[in-house]
Every structure is written in C-alpha cells, then in structure tokens.
Amino acid sequence: ALKNVTGMWLLEECRRSWHTEGRDYEMPELLKLASDAEAFTTLIDPNDPLFAPPGGMPERIQSYCAERGLTPPKTDGEYAICILNSLAHAYKKTLAEISAVTGRTIEVIHILGGGSQNDLLNQLTADICGIIVKTGPVEATLFGNIAVQAISAGVVANLTEARALIEKSFTSKVFQPA
C-alpha cells in the first residue's frame, strides 16, 4: 500500500522563519538540538490544514497548542522534536488506517525522498510504529521516471526488474524498533 504523508514541510518552514530572525541551522545541527530536547513530548497533527500554507510556522504551532491546551515548544530544538515525534505518530495512524482498509499488517515502512536522510526521524518512526523502517533513494521521483522510461523503451522487462535495478543503485539504511 502506498500513501503520502506530510513530511519535512513543517520543519523546513520553521527553518525558513528562523532564518529571517538570524538563526540559521543546517539540518544536522537542528537534529542535534531535537535530539537534545527529546524530553519535550507535545504532539501536533502535521496534517492539520493550519500547517498547509507557507510562512509563520512557529507561530502556527504556538496557536495550535494554545487552542488545544497543549504545552507549546519554547526552543528551536523543542519545535524540531515536536514536529519529528508528531510525524512519526502521524505515520503510525496512517499505518493503522491502511491496515484497516486492506486487512493486511504492514511490516516495513519505506521512507523515500529527503526524509530518507533523517536518521532521527527514521528511528523515531521505527520506535513509535513498532516496525522496521527502510530508507529508499533521496531522488525517488527521478528513479521512478527512469523506471517508466526504461520499461517503455524495452530496456527492462517489467516493474519488478526495474525495482531490482533501482535497489542495487543506492544504499539503504534499516532502522529497527527499540
């Protein structure tokens, strides 16, 4: 089963807001701040329409928390861990929905695109969902496009063969639940 769930949008928008305030973070530095703030446990719904438009993400997270009586993040690290934990919980909810609809138990989550490079999020996802997380290519869209063209041109016989070739073309990481 395939379902796209909001990914790093919220965190990227926070970074953009912080940049305008003179606080620039490279992702490894921000993930370290998040890791250091792991005791902060407030969760938000990353798929809430409030978070869809660009701009002012930290303020919108504050509003979301205030409206629901939740403890709002105070530090940039708390914002980051709040978002990452919330994403992992959103993935867990989505897995339950997919399992209910399909009648199948999902045993592995495949993370593609930019999120595949976020080891903290991937480990949180494995821990919170209680299943293995396997990363795929950062440029998943590109690989998919190449696969379709290769099948159309007769270079590969079918999708199974294309997937096997793609899997040999990148290094995957596997995250086990704690």
Regions found by a protein language model. Name each.
Residues 1-108, 117-141, 147-177:
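Active-site core segments that coordinate phosphate-bearing ligands/cofactors
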Residues 114:
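Glycine-rich Rossmann-fold phosphate-binding loop(s) that bind the pyrophosphate
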